[in-house]
Amino acid sequence: MANKNRRRYKKGKTFKKILREKLGVMIIIILLAFGGLCVRLVYITRDNQESYQKKILTQQRYDSTTLPFKRGNITDRNGTILAVSEKVYNVVLDCKVMLDDERSKEPTLSALAECFGLSRSDLDAYVENNPNSQYYVLKKRLTYDEISPFLDKEKEVAAEAAEFNKTADSDNQKGVINGVWFEEEYTRRYPNNSLACDVIGFTGTDNNGTYGLEEYYNDELNGTNGREYGYLNDDATLERTTIAAVDGHSLVSTIDANIQAIAEKYILQFNEEYRDAAREGAGSYNTGCIIMNPNNGEILAMASYPSYDLNNPKDLSAYYTEEEIKEMQDNNTYYDTLNQLWRNFCISDTYEPGSTAKTITIATGLETGKITGNETYQCAGGLQVADHYIRCNVRSGHGTLDVSGALEQSCNVALMEMGEAIGVKTMIKYENIFNLGLKTNIDLAGEARTASLVYNESTMGESELATSSFGQGFNVTMIEMAAAFSSIVNGGYYYEPHVVSKITNSTGDTVRNIEPRVLKQTISETTSAQMRQYLYAAVAEGTGKSARPAGYAIGGKTGTAEKVPRDHKHYVVSFIGC
């Protein structure tokens, strides 16, 4: 019996020993496996860390909001706002957020319908069909005054719900307005509507400028959008990063809004007065006016007819009937008509300067010594030049005239004789000196190139020299003539025309001053002084009498050029003076 018990004890002891050994082996295997997994995890983390981080981040809830920049202002020289960007709001509904609490649906949709005039049935249908929508724009570009009733309603509903829920049981709690937010952006506004429209230009929906200062200085006026990033971690912690927007720079222009308004007033008055003079039912095809400081190149006013409303640049109703506009849209000429309206006539269109160019011919003759000012000329009403008999503006002739009298009476014959004395080579040289045929580089978009519209030595023959001497046969822009004439009367200094005097940042600090630039000297002080005397006489005693304002002594020159084809009897009439 004792032996039997000893055998049982021995067997039990052996079993336990074997069990411990096996358990030890299993633990070792598990530890080795765990160690291997740890090593593998280290390698995975090291080699694929960025990839796994991205996967984790994509599972988190994000929001990203664009923070719009504010486009810079444009002011006149005295601080009058000509163009400004104003904050507006888009009404956005986030259905998913609203439906997070079913109790929010009713007050939210009711408030939207009430405050913004939206159809409640349309709202219900959209939410029903798009419960996960997070960005549904209900209204665009509303002012703060237009969204204020909703903001007030939101507070009112929240207050009522808070008061009611104090005593209501959990199953009967009232909901609040939720899931509506206001997306901020800026819209461009022009407080003076059509004032200085050719100078200012306008912006499109992409915030980029079209024509004028808006286009030329587009990069200065535009800033950089900011962005606000946010996401919720698994523990509902909100992480948020904000990159602030950088607002655009503002422009201080050389324009004087008061002078600009006066110029536009009288341009419109002229076209109303002579509405049926050339063609029934309309004024001139174009009328332009530049008021420029000859002593520094600053543009004080630049206006033209027809004009347009900068706040509604596609509106043609002032000039065309609904039927005419519809016809344009049907035959694809609508945008051609708009572009013609938007063009700045003073810098983009060319014309024959006519007798205003006689000032350049006489100044060239005096400066080069080809004429002295003591000459006399006999005008019998015309002059034979090569194979052409070229008439004077007075068919019976002016008789005997000196240089001053030739300018006063605008005698073509006398100017043709001066042109002959000057010669082709010198005439071409001085047209270049006065920058005719070259861009002035005024800081406005759309300046025309006229190099192909003036003569050169190979294209100017005897007849071309004769007609050029009194301003026909070649084309220039108004700004070319204004800059050239300014140098004739200011002592001979050719200033680059400019419309902006200063660029400032969003805090009003000066970023850059735009100083007057003298590019060259066209004539001497002596020649300039003599030309001022001639121009004064042309207004006091000559063809420019009607341009003389009461109480002021001015000098200037009239101009009349026949448009091509000459036999149609259409004319460009002009006056240039100071």
Predicted ranges, named:
Residues 1-322, 425-433, 547, 556:
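Periplasmic/cell-envelope proteins involved in peptidoglycan metabolism and beta-lactam response
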Residues 83, 89, 235-242, 287, ...:
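Beta-lactam-recognizing serine transpeptidase/beta-lactamase-like catalytic domain environment
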